[in-house]
Amino acid sequence: MAISKQEAAWQPKPDDVPQLMDEADAGNAISQYNLGVCYAKGNGVEVDLAETVRWLRKAAEQGLPQAQFNLGMCLSRGVGVEKNVVEGTMWLNSAAQQGHAEAERILKQWWGD
């Protein structure tokens, strides 16, 4: 999983997860992203990479660049989902267009300038 060190540093307490789930279900993009991170890392829930991708996708579709980046990496590598480099690159491009530096770096590394 390609969650950056800064993003991975957030660690919910087990008691935080029910509220996070409620907020994510209500459509809060940041909570959806954070819930995806929880499922990726096993923070307050069992590790479930399919759930990681599901929540990242919901947040990415709302335009959250860190979710777009992580969804793009999951898709490009086949983590928690069938590998799809074309769709993964699309999400990385979306994140890069919003100034996500790591997405920009990876796209340059993969495809050149």
Language model regions located:
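TPR/TPR-like alpha-solenoid helical repeat scaffolds
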Residues: 2, 6-10, 100-113
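Hydrophobic face of amphipathic alpha-helices that form TPR/SEL1-like repeat modules
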Residues: 34-41, 70-77, 106-113
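Short helix-capping/linker turns of helical repeat alpha-solenoids
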Residues: 25-28, 41-43, 48, 61-64, ...
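TPR/TPR-like (Sel1-like) alpha-helical repeat modules
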Residues: 82-101, 108-111
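Alpha-helical tetratricopeptide repeat
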Residues: 14-17, 21, 29, 33-37, ...
